[in-house]
């Protein structure tokens, strides 16, 4: 059932869920219930699979997912569920930025650009640098923004092919590469807790461009969490295996 109660009045939603439940009990049916409505999924489903950009990031019994969500995206989804209790307030630590283009997803963990708990191996790249700079520009004066934006240039410059795996290059639109490097160093110093910087092995100017070397990216795998009935695809729970290491292992088999 794909979004069977989406955009319906609450009374109609309840009737449809009640009918589906009756049919399940009377006929022994099994449903694949696709929805963005986690509240109804909690009521209706025995097991839940949370997906992001078409990939399952966490799956397990419904009670286990709701009582102790593991994946940062699952946590964010559950915080966003409306709560009628005014003492709980509104969730303000929801994922930053926009959902990426599914046809060109981020490398490594596709959720990492928006994740508050991202780690060095999550798959950092130059597009993430652009997002961090855009966040910076919400905090500075209009004059400083205009000056820095002239140096950085258009967003498309951050989408250039990597000169080599795990290495990004950015040429300044105006000014010098040293100016661009100074801007990046200033941002790293002003916000050292930003997850991106934990994934940067080094950055330097060669006079023409700034080159940034990122820590080897690893694609998380959906694996069981020890001591639970849940499987999660997240480096916070399983040791990252960089793509280069996986490729080397495959060649030796």
Where do the protein language model's features map onto the residues?
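Charged, flexible cofactor/metal-binding loops and thiol motifs
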Residues: 61-233, 237-251
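P-loop NTP-binding/switch modules centered on Walker-like glycine-rich loops
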Residues: 3-4, 8-90
């Amino acid at each position: 059932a794909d979004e069977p109660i989406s955009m319906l009045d609450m009374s109609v939603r309840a009737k449809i869920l009640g009918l589906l439940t009756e049919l399940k009990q009377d006929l022994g049916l099994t449903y694949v219930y696709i929805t963005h409505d986690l509240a109804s999924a909690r009521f209706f489903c025995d097991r839940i699979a949370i997906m992001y950009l078409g990939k399952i990031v966490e799956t397990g019994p419904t009670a286990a997912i709701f009582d102790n969500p593991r994946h940062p995206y699952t946590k964010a989804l559950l915080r966003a569920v409306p709560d009628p209790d005014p003492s709980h307030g509104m969730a303000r630590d929801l994922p930053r930025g926009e959902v990426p283009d599914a046809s060109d997803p981020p490398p490594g963990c596709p959720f990492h650009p928006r994740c508050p708990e991202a780690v060095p191996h999550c798959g950092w790249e130059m597009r993430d640098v652009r997002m961090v700079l855009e966040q910076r520009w919400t905090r500075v004066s209009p004059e400083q923004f205009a000056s820095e934006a002239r140096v950085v240039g258009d967003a498309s410059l951050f989408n250039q092919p990597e000169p080599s795996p795990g290495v990004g290059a950015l040429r300044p639109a105006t000014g010098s590469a040293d100016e661009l490097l100074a801007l990046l160093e200033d941002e790293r110093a002003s916000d050292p807790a930003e997850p991106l910087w934990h994934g940067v092995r080094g950055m330097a100017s060669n006079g023409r461009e700034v080159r940034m070397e990122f820590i080897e990216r690893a694609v998380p795998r959906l694996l069981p969490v020890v001591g639970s009935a849940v499987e999660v695809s997240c480096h916070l729970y399983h040791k990252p295996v960089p793509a280069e290491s996986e490729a080397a292992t495959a060649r030796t088999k």
